[in-house]
Amino acid sequence: VDEFLNIHVPGHQIPDLLGKVPTDTDAIIMPWRLYGNNERVAIDDVSVTEQFIRCIPAEAQYPVAASLFKTLFRAKGPFNQLGVHRPKQKDPDKAGWPKMVDGSGQPVHPFLAKTPQRLSLYDLGVARDLVELNHYAVRSAAAFVVKRDRGLPNRATKKVDLAYWVERNFNTETDTSISATAPTRDRELATLKSDPRLAELHEAAVDWRRKRFELLMQHEPFRALFGRLLMAPPSRPVTPQAAAFMIRHANLARQSAPQKG
């Protein structure tokens, strides 16, 4: 698991979050927060949210991965089905446009609600006062090598390489706000691990990942990648001016691209 809901409302549960947004809300946009490897190398059997506590600045909009979001939505809203980042929307002529709020509970820009293919918050601002989604895309160097071997579940053709690492390995700030849920997390994990079969499966999964890493290190491409990960410094956020420059050109390229259909 590399995504964890980080609710900043007292109570830190989904019902607490829902109590802070308008009752007619169809969807809540939850911005990603990219967490880096925190200089960890090995595959350790420690909670992800405890191991990796350094991340990109909250206001960052570049690279594009820093501006992506996931969506918490009402099942009875104007949607057809699940999507990776946002649900598939119904025909607005029949169902209307969804009422969406941002991570601070404020209405999103109409463009976002009316552009179902839009998956990023480029130029739309990032709001995370109530909720955000901690995204641990790289984790430790060894874990990343295993991820490279596995690939991405929903984008089989996307390369998991050094460029992928550089665009996500931000360790600029320390943010431990998700630790507010640690007591509940630890209690639930203890309950799960009290089941002998689940405990056995957990140990087997950790053991498999460690052995898989050792096996991959016998092959030059994976060994070379691991070495480069160790040499690569943490990624440095670009300045707001540089981000604006890159976003402007991305928008220009999108506008000039041939329309599908």
Q: Which residues fall in each region the model found?
A:
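C-terminal non-catalytic accessory extensions
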Residues: 220-261
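Acidic metal-phosphate-binding loop of nucleotide-sugar-dependent transferases
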Residues: 2-5
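Catalytic-site signature of metal-activated, phosphate-bearing donor transferases
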Residues: 7-232
